[in-house]
Amino acid sequence: MQRVARIDHPEVHEIVPSHHCVLRFRQRRPVRERGADVVAEALIAALEDADVSRWPPAWAVGDRNTELWAVSGELAFPLERSARHGRYVAVTCLSR
């Protein structure tokens, strides 16, 4: 079962982390407890706490063409639109 972050934003209602995003999140924000469920819960919490903007944080600026970003503290998630209205995919996890 895939976890989905639900947020209150005019364009983005749900964020689904890609497999690559989950792997990068595990590398960039180690979770002290064991188990995939603990990591998934921490990632969903970070996405639900994120501010969605068209502008990346200054430290994440690069040549990536991304329409929207979800930024949660020291983490940034570039978002790609999915086929479902209001649902976006977090393609990776970047950290400062």
Label each residue range with its predicted role.
Residues 1-96:
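Ribonuclease/tRNase effector modules and their secretory precursors
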